[in-house]
């Protein structure tokens, strides 16, 4: 049975809601003309493909007002937050964008999933000295990029993969190789429209309702659903000069990365990755159009002083990019690349440079996606691990990681690159490690598991291995996980550390009924089910 904008299903929900507080209202009084449909398979799936929790309904809102009616009705169905040991009386709601969560964070077992892609996705670009774009929370970043490029403009900070929603990345952080220079995406927002857990539609900014503004940025969907964002823009370069340079020493690799991020006046993008095997070298070169004549000897003894003690050699690759505006001097970007490359201590002559269109550079992971799809390795479980590590602990984490990786059959990239902590706004809800040096590294272990070789038990084993690795890194190195679903409230308390009390207070203020974000598992619900 398919239910569209019908009151039948709303009636069932309303009866359950209203009976919990001993009064009766008509469905239209409770919800108004809200579209609730039966759940589709996608509502209980995500990119991680390791968690599947089915809702009882899906909402495809046409506006922020639709979301507000739903959340307002749910939050008002009980007089206050659940007392210890008491059954909560409001259904849980999760916002789902492009479905790229890793651990069921956008799912709502027995509750309602709000499909934010249904929100208006128009991108309004405003030119001038303070150019910006007003975009819907359900718009994909690639849609934002395409609209802005038509005006010769673009946002400053990106994620590596562009087929993610604006509201989704702003609820987490949003990082890529530009973050050292401009900060994460959550540091590049002028204004938001948010529907709070109580159903209030609020326009907020650093000066207007700032507590809500900073709460939802990196807030893991706990305080509100982002329905619109205002993003600052810069002039977009036509081309990018893209460079890769190879290393056989982790110490030299990271030292050169930190040198690069100290030159924001010259360099526009810095990332890097580990070269574990032939497959990782081939897959990482899918989107890089230059011919790379690098033939690493993986069977050399690894004696780079990193302390790993591995019998097989690990190599590393730095990526950096320079914007090419092609104005008076067509060779200006080439001169910058030559200047910067001359300061690096890579394995000569293994540095490779290519010029690509700006859009193609930002959309580079799409090519890798197409390659993985062609091999049946895209719609598979992705037991990923993302960890922020203070720079003084980077070598230690690399050694911990290499103690858990079976390199011969490892499928997927391992990204490693530095971020500067002063580019993160401490008012936001996002968590990065304390780093006296001002530098943290993101380690992203991005596995794709072939179901023919790694079934359910194998995937569970990888997840457990990652859990142990993350726990040890947090305990020994002061690391913090990114995009993770912590296994317990105690783990979440440890994760937030000194900012835990602020996070809890924000929840009490903006979502006192604990309606939002059940998939994160931060604020447990005795029973979030409608049925």
Regions found by a protein language model. Give the residues of each.
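Noncatalytic alpha-helical scaffold of FAD-dependent oxidoreductases
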Residues: 1-531
């Amino acid at each position: 049975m398919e239910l569209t904008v019908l009151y039948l299903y709303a009636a069932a929900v309303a009866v359950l809601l209203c009976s919990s507080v001993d009064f009766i209202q008509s469905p239209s009084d409770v919800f108004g003309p809200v579209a609730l449909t039966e759940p589709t398979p996608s509502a209980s799936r995500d990119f991680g493909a390791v968690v599947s929790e089915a809702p009882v309904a899906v909402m495809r809102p046409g506006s922020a007002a639709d979301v507000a009616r739903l959340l307002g009705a749910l939050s008002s169905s009980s007089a206050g937050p659940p007392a210890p040991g008491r059954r909560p009386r409001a259904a849980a709601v999760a916002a789902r964008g492009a479905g790229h969560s890793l651990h069921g964070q956008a799912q709502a077992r027995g509750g309602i999933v709000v499909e934010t892609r249904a929100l208006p996705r128009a991108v309004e670009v405003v030119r001038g000295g303070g150019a910006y774009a007003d975009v819907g929370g359900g718009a994909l970043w690639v849609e934002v990029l395409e609209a802005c490029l038509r005006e010769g403009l673009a946002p400053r900070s990106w994620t590596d993969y562009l087929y993610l929603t604006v509201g989704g990345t702003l609820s987490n952080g949003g990082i890529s190789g530009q973050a050292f220079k401009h900060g994460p995406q959550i540091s590049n927002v002028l204004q938001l429209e948010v529907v709070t857990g109580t159903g209030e539609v609020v326009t907020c900014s650093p000066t207007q309702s700032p507590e809500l503004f900073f709460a939802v940025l990196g807030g893991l969907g706990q305080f509100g659903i982002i329905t619109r964002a205002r993003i600052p823009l810069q002039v977009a370069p036509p081309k990018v000069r893209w460079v890769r340079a190879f290393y056989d020493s982790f110490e030299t690799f990271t030292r050169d990365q930190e040198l690069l991020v100290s030159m924001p006046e010259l360099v526009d993008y810095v990332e890097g990755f580990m070269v574990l095997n032939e497959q990782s070298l081939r897959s990482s070169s899918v989107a890089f159009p230059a011919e790379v004549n690098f033939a690493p000897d993986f069977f050399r003894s690894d004696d780079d002083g990193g302390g790993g003690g591995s019998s097989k050699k690990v190599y590393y690759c730095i990526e950096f990019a320079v914007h090419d505006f092609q104005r008076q001097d067509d060779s200006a970007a080439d001169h910058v690349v030559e200047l910067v490359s001359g300061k690096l201590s890579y394995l000569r002559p293994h540095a490779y440079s290519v010029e690509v269109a700006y859009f193609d550079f930002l959309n580079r992971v799409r090519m890798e996606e197409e390659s993985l799809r062609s091999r049946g390795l895209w719609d598979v479980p992705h037991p990923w691990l993302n960890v922020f590590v203070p720079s003084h602990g980077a070598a230690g984490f690399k050694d911990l990681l290499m103690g858990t990786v079976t390199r011969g059959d490892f499928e997927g990239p391992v990204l490693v690159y530095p971020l500067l902590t002063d580019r993160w706004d401490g008012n936001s809800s996002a968590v990065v490690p304390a780093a006296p040096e001002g530098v943290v590294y993101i380690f992203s272990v991005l596995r794709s598991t072939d179901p023919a070789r790694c079934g359910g038990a194998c995937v569970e084993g990888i997840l457990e291995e990652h859990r142990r690795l993350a726990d040890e890194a947090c305990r020994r190195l002061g690391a913090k996980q990114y995009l993770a679903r912590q296994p317990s409230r105690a783990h979440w308390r440890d994760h937030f550390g000194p900012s835990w009390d602020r996070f809890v207070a924000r929840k009490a203020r903006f979502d006192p009924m604990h309606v939002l974000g059940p998939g994160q598992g931060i604020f447990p619900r005795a029973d979030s089910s409608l049925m």
